[in-house]
C-alpha cells in the first residue's frame, strides 16, 4: 500500500505577481525549487494565508535568485501581490518506507529568501 505524504513545502512565501493572461501554473525561483526538491511541471497545492484559498497547479521554474512567486492563469484570481502563501508537493510512499521519509521544508522571509531548511514540521508556530 502507498500513502500520500508531504514531500516538500515552501512556507510563507510572498506573491510577487499575478498574471491572469498566462496559460496557467505558478512560477517559482529555481534556486528555491532546487532547495526543496520540487521539479518543473510538478503538481503542487497552493494555500493562500490571506484568504484561505487552496488550489492545485503545476510549477514553472523562474529566474534564479529572483525570489519570484507568480501565479499564472486562472489561479491569479485567487491571490494578490503581497499575499503570503504556502506551496506543498506530495509523494506516494510505500508503507515500508514511511518511517524513513523526510520532507524538505523551506521557511521563507519577507523577501522570499530561505531562512531555514527543516525536515519535519515544527511543534510550534513558525512565522
Curated annotation (Swiss-Prot):
InterPro entries xrefs: Asp_de-COase-like_dom_sf, Asp_decarbox
Residues carrying Pyruvic acid (Ser): 25
Keywords: Autocatalytic cleavage, Cytoplasm, Decarboxylase, Lyase, Pantothenate biosynthesis, Pyruvate, Schiff base, Zymogen
Cross-referenced CDD domains: Asp_decarbox
Entry binding sites for substrate: 57, 73-75
Broadest EC class assigned to this enzyme: lyase
Catalysis performed (reactions): L-aspartate + H(+) = beta-alanine + CO2
Cofactor binding mode and count: Binds 1 pyruvoyl group covalently per subunit.
A single GO cellular-component term on record: cytosol
GO terms assigned for molecular function: aspartate 1-decarboxylase activity
Transmembrane feature ranges: none
Protein family according to the UniProt entry: Belongs to the PanD family.
Quaternary structure note: Heterooctamer of four alpha and four beta subunits.
Protein name: Aspartate 1-decarboxylase
Amino acid at each position: 500500500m502507498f500513502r500520500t505524504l508531504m514531500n516538500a513545502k515552501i512556507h510563507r512565501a510572498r506573491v510577487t505577481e499575478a498574471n491572469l493572461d498566462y496559460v496557467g501554473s505558478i512560477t517559482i525561483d529555481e534556486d528555491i525549487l532546487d532547495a526543496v526538491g520540487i521539479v518543473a511541471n510538478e503538481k503542487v497545492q497552493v494555500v493562500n494565508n490571506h484568504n484561505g484559498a487552496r488550489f492545485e497547479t503545476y510549477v514553472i521554474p523562474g529566474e534564479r535568485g529572483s525570489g519570484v512567486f507568480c501565479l499564472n492563469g486562472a489561479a491569479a484570481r485567487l491571490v494578490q501581490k503581497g499575499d503570503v502563501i504556502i506551496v506543498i508537493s506530495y509523494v506516494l510512499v510505500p508503507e515500508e518506507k514511511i518511517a524513513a521519509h523526510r520532507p524538505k521544508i523551506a521557511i521563507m522571509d519577507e523577501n522570499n529568501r530561505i531562512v531555514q531548511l527543516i525536515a519535519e514540521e515544527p511543534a510550534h508556530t513558525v512565522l
